[in-house]
C-alpha cells in the first residue's frame, strides 16, 4: 500500500509539471505571435501627421486610420475605429476643408495686397485733389501773380473774359502801368535765366527765387508808398482805373467779370487805397451774384467781405465802404447757420444806417434798408425769439417801415429798381391798399429785368396780377 501511495504521488507531481510546462509553452506561443504582428504593423505604419492620422501600406487603396490625439496617458489608446468607408468620407471632407482653407488664405492675401494698392491710390488722389484746391485758392487770392495768358484763356469763373474786350497795359484808358506788366517781365527774365542755368544747384535756385520775391515785395511797397505820398498825382494815376471799373460794373455780365479781373490785376499796386478796396469788394459781390456754384458763392462773399473790412480799416467815413460791407454780409449770411444769419442781419442794418447817414441821397441804401425791414417784419415767432436771445437789442421793423424806405429810394431815383416797385406793391397790398398796390404793380411791369432779384420776384409779380386783377 505504501508503494502504491508513493507511485500515485509521483504521477501527480509529474502531471502537475507537464501541465505547467504546457501552459508556459502556450503563453510563449501567444506572446511570439503578438510580437510578430506588432512588428509587421510597425513596419507598415507611417509617422502621424499634423491631424493625428496615419496611412496604411495597402497597395490597392490608401486608407487613413484615425488615431487618438496624444494625451497625458501616452499614445497607447486608440479611438474606436470607424468602418473603412466612413473613414474615407471623413478624411475626404477633411481634405476638402484643408484645400478650401488654403485657397481662402490665398484669396485673403490677394485681397489684402489689392486693398493696400487701392488705399495708396485713394490717398494719392485725395492728396492731389487737395493740392489742386490749394492752387486754385491761391490763384483766386493772388491772381496778379498769374501770367497774362492765364487770365484771358482760363475757363475758371474767376477769370472769364472775352478776348476782344481784354484790357492790356497798352490799351488802358489812362495809360497807367499795372503790376502785371512788371511781374510778366520779371517772370520772362526768370525763365530765360533758368533755361540758361540748368547746371545750377537746387539751393542756388531757391535762393534766387527768394530774392526775386523779396524784390517784388519791395517794389510793391515802394509803389504803395509813392501813391500815398503822391497825393493828387496818385489820384490822377488811379482815377482812370476807378472810372473804368465803375463803367464795367454798370454793364452786363461780361463787363462785370472783366471789371473783377481788372481790379484783381491791379491790387498789388493800388491795394492800399480805400477807394480801390471797396470797388474790389463790390466786384466780389458781383461775382457772387453771377456764379451758380454754392461753394463759389460763399467763397466770393467771404473774400469780398474781407476786402470791405480792409477798406473800413482805412477810414470809417466812406458810405460806399459801409454799403458794400452790408451787401456782402447779407450774401454771406445765405450760407450760414440761423445764429450767424441773425448776427449778420444786425451788422447789415448797422452799416446800412451808417451809409445813409454819410450819403443820404443814395437810393440803393434806402432800397437795402427797405428790404431788410420787410424781411424782419415777416420773421416767424421762433426767429424773433432767437434774435432776442442772441442780441442785446431785438430786431424790430414793420411793413410800413419797409414801404417808406422803398418809396424814398423811388423818390431819389424813379425806376431805380424793378424789385423795389414789386416790394412797394406787396407792402400796399399787405396794408390793405389795393388800389395803390395795383398802381405800383403796373409800374413794375414797365421795367425790364436787370438783376437776378428782379427775375426772382417775377413769380410774386404774377401772383399780384392775379390777386389785384380789376
UniProtKB/Swiss-Prot annotation:
Coiled coil (residue ranges): 92-124
Biased composition (Low complexity): 220-231
Entry superkingdom: Eukaryota
Pfam families: RMD1-3
Positions of post-translational Phosphoserine modification: 44, 46, 50, 57, 183, 193, 212, 232
Molecular function (Gene Ontology), one example: microtubule binding
Residue spans crossing the bilayer: 13-35
Motif FFAT, residue range(s) on this chain: 157-163
List of residues that carry Phosphothreonine: 160
Protein modification: Phosphorylation at Thr-160 of the FFAT motif activates interaction with MOSPD2, VAPA and VAPB.
Subcellular location: Mitochondrion outer membrane; Cytoplasm; Nucleus; Cytoplasm, Cytoskeleton, Spindle
GO biological process terms, semicolon-separated: apoptotic process; cell differentiation; intracellular calcium ion homeostasis
Keyword RNA-binding: no
Membrane topology: Single-pass membrane protein
Keywords of this entry: Apoptosis, Coiled coil, Cytoplasm, Cytoskeleton, Differentiation, Membrane, Microtubule, Mitochondrion, Mitochondrion outer membrane, Nucleus, Phosphoprotein, Transmembrane, Transmembrane helix
Subunit description: Interacts with PTPN2. Interacts with microtubules. Interacts with VAPB. Interacts (via FFAT motif) with MOSPD2 (via MSP domain). Interacts (via phosphorylated FFAT motif) with MOSPD2, VAPA and VAPB.
Function: Involved in cellular calcium homeostasis regulation. May participate in differentiation and apoptosis of keratinocytes. Overexpression induces apoptosis.
Record comment regarding domains: The transmembrane region is required for mitochondrial localization.
Protein name: Regulator of microtubule dynamics protein 3
Organism: Pongo abelii
Lineage, uppermost ranks: Eukaryota, Metazoa, Chordata, Craniata, Vertebrata
Amino acid at each position: 500500500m505504501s508503494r502504491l501511495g508513493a507511485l500515485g504521488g509521483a504521477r501527480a507531481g509529474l502531471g502537475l509539471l507537464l501541465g505547467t510546462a504546457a501552459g508556459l509553452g502556450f503563453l510563449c506561443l501567444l506572446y511570439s505571435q503578438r510580437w510578430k504582428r506588432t512588428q509587421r504593423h510597425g513596419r507598415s505604419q507611417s509617422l502621424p501627421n499634423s491631424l493625428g492620422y496615419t496611412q496604411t501600406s495597402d497597395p490597392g487603396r490608401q486608407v487613413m486610420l484615425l488615431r487618438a490625439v496624444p494625451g497625458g496617458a501616452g499614445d497607447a489608446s486608440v479611438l474606436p475605429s470607424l468602418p473603412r468607408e466612413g473613414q474615407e468620407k471623413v478624411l475626404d471632407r477633411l481634405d476638402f476643408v484643408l484645400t478650401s482653407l488654403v485657397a481662402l488664405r490665398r484669396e485673403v492675401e490677394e485681397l489684402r495686397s489689392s486693398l493696400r494698392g487701392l488705399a495708396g491710390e485713394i490717398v494719392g488722389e485725395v492728396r492731389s485733389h487737395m493740392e489742386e484746391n490749394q492752387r486754385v485758392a491761391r490763384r483766386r487770392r493772388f491772381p496778379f501773380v498769374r501770367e497774362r495768358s492765364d487770365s484771358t484763356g482760363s475757363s475758371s469763373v474767376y477769370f472769364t473774359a472775352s478776348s476782344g474786350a481784354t484790357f492790356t497795359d497798352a490799351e488802358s484808358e489812362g495809360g497807367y502801368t499795372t503790376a502785371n506788366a512788371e511781374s510778366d517781365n520779371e517772370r520772362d527774365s526768370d525763365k530765360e535765366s533758368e533755361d540758361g542755368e540748368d547746371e545750377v544747384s537746387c539751393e542756388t535756385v531757391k535762393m534766387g527765387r527768394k530774392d526775386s520775391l523779396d524784390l517784388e515785395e519791395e517794389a510793391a511797397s515802394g509803389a504803395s508808398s509813392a501813391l500815398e505820398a503822391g497825393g493828387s498825382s496818385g489820384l490822377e494815376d488811379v482815377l482812370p482805373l476807378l472810372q473804368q471799373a465803375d463803367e464795367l460794373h454798370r454793364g452786363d455780365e461780361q463787363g462785370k467779370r472783366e471789371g473783377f479781373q481788372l481790379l484783381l490785376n491791379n491790387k498789388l499796386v493800388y491795394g492800399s487805397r480805400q477807394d480801390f478796396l471797396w470797388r474790389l469788394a463790390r466786384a466780389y459781390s458781383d461775382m457772387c451774384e453771377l456764379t451758380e456754384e454754392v461753394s463759389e458763392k460763399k467763397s466770393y462773399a467771404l473774400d469780398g467781405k474781407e476786402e470791405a473790412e480792409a477798406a473800413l480799416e482805412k477810414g470809417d467815413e466812406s458810405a460806399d465802404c459801409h454799403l458794400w460791407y452790408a451787401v456782402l454780409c447779407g450774401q454771406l449770411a445765405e450760407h450760414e447757420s440761423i445764429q450767424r444769419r441773425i448776427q449778420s442781419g444786425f451788422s447789415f442794418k448797422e452799416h446800412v444806417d451808417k451809409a445813409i447817414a454819410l450819403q443820404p441821397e443814395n437810393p440803393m441804401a434806402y432800397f437795402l434798408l427797405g428790404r431788410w425791414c420787410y424781411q424782419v417784419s415777416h420773421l416767424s415767432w421762433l426767429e424773433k425769439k432767437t434774435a432776442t436771445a442772441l442780441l442785446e437789442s431785438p430786431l424790430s421793423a414793420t411793413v410800413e417801415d419797409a414801404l417808406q424806405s422803398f418809396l424814398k429810394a423811388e423818390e431819389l431815383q424813379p425806376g431805380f429798381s424793378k424789385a423795389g416797385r414789386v416790394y412797394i406793391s406787396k407792402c400796399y397790398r399787405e396794408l390793405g391798399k389795393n388800389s395803390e398796390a395795383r398802381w405800383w404793380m403796373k409800374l413794375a411791369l414797365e421795367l425790364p429785368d436787370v438783376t437776378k432779384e428782379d427775375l426772382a420776384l417775377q413769380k410774386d409779380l404774377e401772383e399780384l396780377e392775379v390777386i389785384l386783377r380789376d
